[in-house]
Curated annotation (Swiss-Prot):
Gene Ontology cellular component terms for the protein in this record: extracellular region
UniProt note: domains: A long coiled coil structure formed by 3 polypeptide chains connects the central nodule to the C-terminal domains (distal nodules). The long C-terminal ends of the alpha chains fold back, contributing a fourth strand to the coiled coil structure.
Complex formation: Heterohexamer; disulfide linked. Contains 2 sets of 3 non-identical chains (alpha, beta and gamma). The 2 heterotrimers are in head to head conformation with the N-termini in a small central domain.
Functional description taken from the UniProt entry: Cleaved by the protease thrombin to yield monomers which, together with fibrinogen beta (FGB) and fibrinogen gamma (FGG), polymerize to form an insoluble fibrin matrix. Fibrin has a major function in hemostasis as one of the primary components of blood clots. In addition, functions during the early stages of wound repair to stabilize the lesion and guide cell migration during re-epithelialization. Was originally thought to be essential for platelet aggregation, based on in vitro studies using anticoagulated blood.
Post-translational modification, as annotated: Conversion of fibrinogen to fibrin is triggered by thrombin, which cleaves fibrinopeptides A and B from alpha and beta chains, and thus exposes the N-terminal polymerization sites responsible for the formation of the soft clot. The soft clot is converted into the hard clot by factor XIIIA which catalyzes the epsilon-(gamma-glutamyl)lysine cross-linking between gamma chains (stronger) and between alpha chains (weaker) of different monomers. Forms F13A-mediated cross-links between a glutamine and the epsilon-amino group of a lysine residue, forming fibronectin-fibrinogen heteropolymers.
Annotated keywords: Adaptive immunity, Blood coagulation, Coiled coil, Disulfide bond, Hemostasis, Immunity, Innate immunity, Secreted
UniProt GO BP: adaptive immune response; blood coagulation; innate immune response
The protein's name in its UniProt record: Fibrinogen alpha chain
Domain of life per record: Eukaryota
Localization annotation: Secreted
Length: 19
């Protein structure tokens, strides 16, 4: 959810750093 990962899993629209 920190936006560090463009394919994040917590909040896709926000980038989400957690998968």
């Amino acid at each position: 959810a920190d936006g560090s990962d463009p394919a994040g899993g917590e909040f896709l629209e926000a980038g989400g750093g957690v998968r």
